[in-house]
Every structure is written in C-alpha cells, then in structure tokens.
Amino acid sequence: MTEVVAREVYYCGVCSFPPEYCEFGVSLKRCKDWLQDNNQELFDKIYSDDALATQTSTLSIERQEKISQELAKKQLKEEAKQERELQKKLASKVLIKRIERNRRKHIISISGLEVFNIDMKKLAKTFASKFATGASVTKTADKKEEILVQGDVSDEAKEYIEKLLEEQGLNGVEVEQVDEKKKKKATAPGATPAA
C-alpha cells in the first residue's frame, strides 16, 4: 500500500486564507504586501503580469473595471474600519483596582479589557494558575465584565496585562493602578472604637 502524503497549504498571515483566495477578502492590498515580503515565489506565481493576464482574459473590460472599483471600495472601507478600531483600542485604558477586604486582605479588580477582544474567562483562569490565587469573572453594575483576583498581585497583573497587550501590538494602551480603601464605619458619638 502506498503512503498518502498530506498536501502543504500556505496560509496568508493577514486574512488567514490561502493566498489564492485573498482576492475574495477585504484586505487584498495588505495581503499582497505580506505575501511579497514572506514568499516572493508564490507572489510571482499569483500576481505576476502573465498570471493576471491569463486570469482576466475571459472577462470583458467593463466587468473588470467594475470588479476592481468594487474591490477598491471594500478595501477602503475595511481599512477605515480597522483604523477606527485601533484608535478606539489605543484611546481606552485598563483599570486595576486594589480593594481592601479586611485589615490585611486585598482583592484586585481588573476592568477595561473587553475592548481588546480578550477572553476574560481564559485570562481569569491564567491569573488563578499564575498567581496561585482565586480568580473569577463578574459583571459590574454597568453590565461590563471585570476580573476579580484574590490577593495583592496588582503589580504582577499589570506587568502581565502590558505584555499581553504588547503581543497584540497595542503598546500605547494605558494600564492604570488605583488603590481603593474600604470606608471605615462611623462610630456613634461617645462610643469608643473597637480595637
């Protein structure tokens, strides 16, 4: 019996399609640039003048122009959308609150991560195993998710979140630490505070 060899498929680093199908996506220009930088041989095979001429020889000139105009319009829309999303991400900030529970016990609350398409449950699980503490995802009063981590690990959490955002190419995002102390109960006039 003969051995069946799996076919090697090369995928685009921008749209994750095979390069032959990048033209059906909305980021063709970026896909072409990426392919030219990473695999010149395949780029020449797909986008050389001869290859383009054979592909378009069956289409009428009007149809070709219409297709290229529609494609250019879609690409511009997609680029504008991606630019808006990037600006929104860079303008937002992550807030790490250190909240005092008892005298020496603290929890930290991490909010503002939902903008960055980060799986909150997975991140909470990572924090729980990385810091050997309890961590959970809860909803705030304004229906946004936050991660609650037991223990005073705000500095370590800040470093980890900054590294995580840097991996996504978001170096300009502000990660702010806030110390929130529990309000002490007011004592009645004339009463002595408990020690």
UniProtKB/Swiss-Prot annotation:
Q: Does the keyword Transmembrane apply?
A: no
Sorted UniProt keywords = Cytoplasm, Ribonucleoprotein, Ribosomal protein
- Name the Gene Ontology biological process terms: formation of translation preinitiation complex; translation reinitiation
Using the UniProt annotation, give all residue ranges assigned to the region (Disordered).
176-195
Where does the UniProt entry say this protein principally localizes? Answer: cytoplasm
- Which cellular component appears as one GO term in the record? ribonucleoprotein complex
- Cellular compartments annotated: Cytoplasm
Q: Which residues form the SUI1 domain?
A: 94-165
* Molecular function in Gene Ontology: mRNA binding; translation initiation factor activity
Family, according to the entry, reads as follows: Belongs to the DENR family.
Protein name listed in UniProt: Translation machinery-associated protein 22
Q: Which organism is it from?
A: Scheffersomyces stipitis (strain ATCC 58785 / CBS 6054 / NBRC 10063 / NRRL Y-11545) (Yeast)
